[in-house]
């Protein structure tokens, strides 16, 4: 999304890696496991100090990186029962909001303090969904949690579900029909097809659209962004 927003729609984008695995940070070769990352600084101190926002190789896209120090930061926040725990990213991002058109937060699947902070700070949530039983079960739980967090952030909404890694089969098609008709959530028309060389793209440290622009998945992502932007974003 960040790449398309910057290159096609000329938007200024802040990418926020909120996953301790740091996959987005690794993609842009900005992962450093030896220092406290920008996401950790924001979670602990409620600010993005100079140096915590880094330039990526994509003009118009900056990054707040992450690593396994995030786990230590979360434990520290949990232990602090005197200070508010859920408004930390909101305060940090508010200070730089004028510099960007979009902030995209990449979250892990678990709903820890860092993810709650991200939802409190955001306007909308896009849920990527694989069409398997575990993902669909987790989807219902996540949707319920987002609704609960509205007590802390009344503006937040689930913008929609994006079907990813799609491989055609009777079971997958049945699951997609259920998702679109029975889940009660908006599902984007465009789904993202499975790309067998996706792992190769991560090794090359390139986005799928840069690694193989002609692949079905790359074209699907561009079509999804067009659909998303038509929604008035």
Question: How should these model regions be labeled?
Answer:
Residues 1-233:
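P-loop NTP-binding core
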């Amino acid at each position: 999304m960040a790449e398309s927003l910057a290159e096609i729609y000329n938007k200024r984008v802040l990418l926020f890696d909120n996953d301790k695995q740091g996959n987005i940070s690794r993609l842009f070769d900005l992962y450093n496991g030896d220092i406290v990352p920008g996401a950790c600084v924001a979670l602990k101190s409620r600010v993005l100090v100079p140096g915590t926002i880094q330039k990526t190789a994509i003009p118009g896209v900056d990054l707040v990186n992450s690593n396994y120090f995030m786990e230590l930061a979360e434990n520290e926040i949990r232990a602090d029962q005197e200070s508010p725990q859920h408004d930390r990213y909101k305060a940090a991002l508010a200070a730089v909001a004028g510099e960007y058109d979009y902030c995209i937060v990449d979250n892990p699947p678990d709903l820890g303090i860092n993810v709650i902070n991200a939802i409190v700070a955001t306007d909308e949530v896009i849920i990527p969904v694989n069409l398997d039983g575990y993902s669909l079960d987790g989807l219902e739980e996540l949707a319920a949690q987002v609704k609960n967090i509205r007590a802390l952030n009344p503006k937040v909404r689930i913008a929609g579900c994006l079907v990813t890694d799609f491989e055609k089969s009777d079971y997958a098609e049945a699951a997609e029909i259920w998702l679109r008709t029975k889940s009660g959530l908006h599902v984007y028309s465009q789904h993202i097809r499975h790309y067998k060389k996706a792992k190769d793209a991560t090794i090359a440290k390139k986005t799928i659209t840069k690694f193989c622009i002609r692949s079905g998945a790359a074209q699907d992502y561009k079509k999804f962004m067009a659909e998303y932007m038509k929604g008035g974003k």
